């Protein structure tokens, strides 16, 4: 790619509650993936010349976590701390991608059913602080569907902060049938911390929570039949796995491996009065027009990091089959790259020639203000 072309390449930035995925439109994977964390020192710096900063972002915050207080500016998919969010965007553009934002149109993503003020403020910061020439805000689940090469289907997107079901027909999201569940990866990590404590292992601090997140990502899986799996775990050691902690201590984990993600299907495990992800998917389909349900049942697309557990697709298939009419054909699509499918969809969308007239330009923003985002982005 010549320098001339690189100038106008769009930037795609998927701001998740847990990870920021960013890169250039047309690429097949994000260039930069780092935790959505801003850390501030808990102690006063005493050594002169150490170049201590008053805040650290992403991987640097993660590596210095022992001396920092870590905060996630995005909670349940909603930006709650704008100053920190600005730091994250600044870090993305200048340190990770090393671009001048005023030269690149920028595509951002957000969770469905977010407060309107959230996307207005995103728009305002992009144009006024970063001076981008153009920008767009896309719904995460819709992008995942693009990435799977479909225009019709129901997306079950589960990330770190929020899970949602979005039925989409011929490229249109059906807002009345969107189901949002504030139960996701972070809650599962907390639950695993809790049940490991019952085994006698203690995990408390924000740093130790990150260790438990790693255990979760490496060892957890979804049981096809929970009761039967519990019986197997009780009668033999075949399901036990060991994990080495950073200090060399080895811990053994058994039924916790599948009890943790079971929460997705039984939110009552963590005291939530809510239907599991299989039921929210079914309810979402039932809120759609009777004529399009068949197409949705046949195109159940999983996306997001919390759908990466082994066994989750088979379990979804089993649970939805039990709820749906008996003659219905049900298909669960679980693409291997689904951890990043929102970003990939954004990369596809931003590089389509037909999309180029969809951008909100700086000129349009100057004329209409932040509310332009509701007119141009659905």
Swiss-Prot record:
Matching SMART domains, A to Z?
Answer: ACTIN
Q: EC number(s)?
A: 3.6.4.-
Q: What is its main location?
A: cytoplasm
- According to its UniProt record, which reaction does this protein catalyse? ATP + H2O = ADP + phosphate + H(+)
Q: Which GO terms describe its cellular component?
A: cytoplasm; cytoskeleton
Cytoplasm keyword on record: yes
Q: Name one GO molecular function term.
A: ATP binding
Write down the InterPro entries for this protein, in alphabetical order.
Actin, Actin/actin-like_CS, Actin_CS, ATPase_NBD
PROSITE patterns noted in UniProt: ACTINS_1, ACTINS_2, ACTINS_ACT_LIKE
Top-rank lineage group of the source organism: Eukaryota
- Which keywords belong to this entry? ATP-binding, Cytoplasm, Cytoskeleton, Hydrolase, Muscle protein, Nucleotide-binding
Task: Look at the named UniProt entry and state the broad enzyme category this protein falls under.
Answer: hydrolase
Q: Where in the cell is it found?
A: Cytoplasm, Cytoskeleton
Under the heading Pfam families, the entry gives:
Actin
The family this protein is said to belong to: Belongs to the actin family.
Q: What does this protein do?
A: Actins are highly conserved proteins that are involved in various types of cell motility and are ubiquitously expressed in all eukaryotic cells.
State the oligomer form and interacting partners: Polymerization of globular actin (G-actin) leads to a structural filament (F-actin) in the form of a two-stranded helix. Each actin can bind to 4 others.
Q: What is this protein called?
A: Actin, muscle
To which species is this protein native? Styela clava (Sea squirt)
Q: Which gene encodes it?
A: TB12
């Amino acid at each position: 790619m010549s320098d001339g072309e690189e100038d106008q390449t769009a930037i795609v930035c998927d701001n998740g509650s847990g990870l920021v995925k960013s890169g250039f439109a047309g690429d097949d994977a994000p260039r930069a993936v780092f935790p959505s964390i801003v850390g501030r020192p808990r102690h006063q710096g005493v050594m002169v010349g150490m170049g201590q900063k008053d805040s650290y972002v992403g991987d640097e915050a993660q590596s210095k976590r022992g001396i920092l207080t870590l905060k996630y500016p995005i909670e349940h998919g909603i930006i709650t701390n704008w100053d920190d969010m600005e730091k994250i965007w600044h870090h993305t553009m200048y340190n990770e991608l090393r671009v001048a934002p005023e030269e690149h149109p920028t595509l951002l993503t957000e969770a469905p059913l977010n407060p309107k003020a959230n996307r207005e403020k995103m728009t305002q910061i992009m144009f006024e602080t970063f001076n981008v020439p153009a920008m767009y805000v896309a719904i995460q689940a819709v992008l995942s569907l693009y990435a799977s090469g479909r225009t019709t289907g129901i997306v079950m997107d589960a990330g770190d902060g929020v899970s949602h079901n979005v039925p989409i027909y011929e490229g249109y999201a059906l807002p009345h049938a969107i189901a949002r569940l504030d139960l996701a990866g972070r809650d599962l990590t907390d639950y695993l911390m809790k049940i490991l404590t019952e085994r006698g292992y203690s995990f408390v601090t924000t740093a130790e929570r990150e260790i438990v997140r790693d255990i979760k990502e490496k060892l957890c899986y979804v049981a096809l039949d929970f009761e039967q799996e519990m019986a197997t775990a009780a009668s033999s050691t075949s399901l036990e796995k060991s994990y080495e902690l950073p200090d060399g201590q080895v811990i053994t984990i058994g039924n916790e491996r599948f009890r943790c993600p079971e929460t997705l299907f039984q939110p009552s495990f963590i005291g939530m009065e809510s239907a599991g992800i299989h039921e929210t998917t079914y309810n979402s389909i039932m809120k759609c027009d009777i004529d399009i349900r068949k197409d949705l049942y046949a195109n159940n697309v999983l996306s997001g990091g919390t759908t990466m557990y082994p066994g989750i697709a088979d379990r979804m298939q089993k649970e939805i089959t039990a709820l749906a009419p008996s003659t219905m054909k049900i298909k669960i699509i679980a693409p291997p790259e689904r951890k990043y499918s929102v970003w990939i969809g954004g990369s596809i969308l931003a590089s389509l020639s037909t999309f180029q007239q969809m951008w909100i330009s700086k000129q349009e923003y100057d004329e209409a203000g932040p509310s332009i985002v509701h007119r141009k982005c659905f």
